[in-house]
Amino acid sequence: MAANWLLLDGSSLMFRAFFGIPVGTFKAPDGQPVNAVRGFLDMLARLVSDRKPKALVVATDEDWRPAFRVKVIASYKTARLERGAMPAELQPQEPIIWAILNAIGVEVMGAAGFEAEDVIASLLPKITGTVEIVTGDRD
């Protein structure tokens, strides 16, 4: 049975798409890499086709290392501090992905100071029916 709601951790899936397709495999006419755009849209199409949700929300990280979480766990995502939060080739692709989703009517939600999983958790009490959460995060 299909879930009524499909909630996606968009930031996590965007990183998976970026690292899953080598940079340079797909380029925009201006030469900019769009591997993450292509990979994300392919994943989204497959998820919607396979799961047939009645409603879809893509949550985003507006802060990948929230202060409230670091206060509790000082080492939270410290490895990313050394290598940087986002690869340079991915940065220009992020707004393209969110713009495409908005253009096709997919709700994209984020909250300042929070990660996508926090946004998803805040939606759950407001949702009736079955829910499926899709993320690449392991925490």
Question: Model segments located where?
Answer:
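Noncatalytic, basic helical substrate-engagement surface that gates or grips nucleic-acid strands
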Residues: A2-V134
